[in-house]
């Protein structure tokens, strides 16, 4: 793991690290607002590390949800990670000792950083994956602790903080559209998502849309490799 790879990886991850720090501070504030201390912030951000699911978990904890309800909700919220993993099978197959952690730490934003870049020849690709994944999680853990501590010291109005995660998704999408010449995946995802939203409703559209998007992109894989659209 050379110095150049470390520096390059951190620079690449810096936008997500910044966003994660802000979002996780919000999570820490909400956690404290629900009556859970910084120890819970460390535990959840280390052991769960799934931004949107951590926000959902707060509601599940505060309402005393059953294990079955929690399991079903977790599956529904994080089912998209299954599709991320499918696309990374080849990349992660030779990751060696890094592989278990890479699988665990594959979040939406980390996926957006590791699935698209054309890395310089002198940058170790597997080390890049690992460092980006690690620093992203460390920034999330640090922000969670800071938010929890601040929430204990200073009173905050936490209304609307959970929308920050959605805002980050939108920003990442716009950055990807700006950098990439291939806009067909985003257009395909948008059209299919709207279709499934209208067909299945806001509470049921996520899984069908992810399945249809994955099928559509596999079908269009060859044309995507040739196209600049």
Give residue ranges: language-model regions.
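Short, Lys/Arg-rich, polar N-terminal cytosolic tail immediately upstream
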Residues: 1-8
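Pore-lining transmembrane helices
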Residues: 8-103, 117, 139, 185
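Helix-loop-helix junctions within the multi-pass membrane cores of secondary transporters/permeases
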Residues: 72-162
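Membrane-embedded alpha-helical modules
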Residues: 124-208, 215
């Amino acid at each position: 793991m050379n110095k150049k790879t470390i520096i390059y990886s951190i620079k690449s991850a810096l936008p997500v690290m910044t966003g994660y720090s802000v979002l996780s501070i919000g999570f820490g504030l909400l956690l404290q607002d629900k009556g859970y201390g910084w120890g819970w912030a460390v535990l959840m951000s280390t052991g769960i590390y799934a931004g949107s699911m951590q926000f959902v978990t707060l509601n599940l904890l505060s309402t005393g949800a059953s294990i079955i309800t929690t399991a079903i909700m977790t599956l529904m919220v994080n089912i998209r990670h299954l599709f991320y993993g499918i696309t990374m099978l080849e990349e992660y197959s030779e990751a060696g000792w890094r592989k278990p952690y890479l699988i665990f730490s594959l979040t939406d934003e980390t996926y957006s950083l590791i699935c698209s870049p054309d890395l310089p020849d002198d940058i170790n690709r597997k080390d890049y994956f690992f460092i980006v994944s690690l620093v992203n999680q460390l920034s999330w853990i640090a922000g969670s602790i800071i938010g929890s501590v601040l929430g204990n010291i200073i009173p905050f109005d936490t209304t609307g903080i959970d929308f920050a995660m959605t805002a980050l998704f939108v920003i990442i999408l716009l950055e990807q559209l700006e950098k990439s010449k291939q806009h067909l995946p985003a257009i395909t995802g948008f059209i299919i998502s709207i279709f499934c939203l209208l067909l299945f409703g806001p509470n049921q559209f996520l899984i069908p849309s992810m399945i249809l998007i994955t099928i559509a992109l596999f079908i269009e894989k060859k044309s995507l490799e040739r196209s600049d659209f």
